[in-house]
Amino acid sequence: MDYEGIVYRPPSEARSLIIQVTIGCAHNTCGFCNMYKEKKFRIRSLAEILADLTEVSHNPYAPYIEKVFLADGDALVMKTEDLLVILDAIHRLYPGVKRVASYGTAQDILRKSEEELIRLREAGLGIVYVGAESGDNEILKYINKGVTAEQTIEAGQKLKRCGIATSVTLISGLGGRSKVEEHALSCAKLITAMNPEYASFLTLRLYAVSYTHLTLPTIA
């Protein structure tokens, strides 16, 4: 099995089998992010994905795999029926797997019905990692996140109603010096409203290859 480009995963998925079901990120225009800039987004075919799962299942370590992470940036953009086929194959080929995880954007979560999400949970999708970044809509607009804080909250609450755990990440310093208080308070309010199983802050680092030339406002 060959990965396409650099593959990213959450720290807690360090021991997971990583399977690329999509390449890159469908949005891919966040001003702070360079993770998928070298990739043209596409959804991999079921044949490709199932071939990878079958190939790895012959590895002598396969019986010890307990977690699978569906990469790249937003696996939930896939059709639910295709995801169900993938989840079924995972549990058929890797009977020791206890949890399947993926990244998920608020847009993708909201596009799926609760019935679809429940079916995914019943098929083994245990946790979705959601990058909220901030709870302040001005900041979200500035970084070209593509969603509002209210949409992210709604997506998190929807996952909770469907029994899927949520791990939400926010970015420390994203508002710059001039919006330190607004960023901090809005993040706290967002976490409270979402009530995720896990919440963590990441450190901001800017890259020249980001989609926009993001500069943080500072106090004069």
Which residues does each predicted region cover?
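Canonical Radical SAM [4Fe-4S] cluster-binding loop centered on the CxxxCxxC motif
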Residues: I6-A51
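Conserved functional loop/turn residues at catalytic and ligand-binding sites
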Residues: T29, N34, G124, G163, ...
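Alpha-helix N-cap and loop-to-helix initiation/capping positions
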Residues: F41-R44, E48, M78, D82, ...
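Short microdomains enriched in Cys/His and/or Lys/Arg
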Residues: A47-Y61
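Conserved SAM/AdoMet-binding glycine-rich loop
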Residues: H58-R161
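Residue-level marker for beta-strand->alpha-helix junctions and adjacent short loops that shape enzyme
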Residues: A75, Q107, G135, G173-G175, ...
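Conserved C-terminal portion of the radical SAM core fold
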Residues: I127, E150-S210
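Conserved small/polar residues in nucleotide/adenosyl-binding loops
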Residues: T212-T218
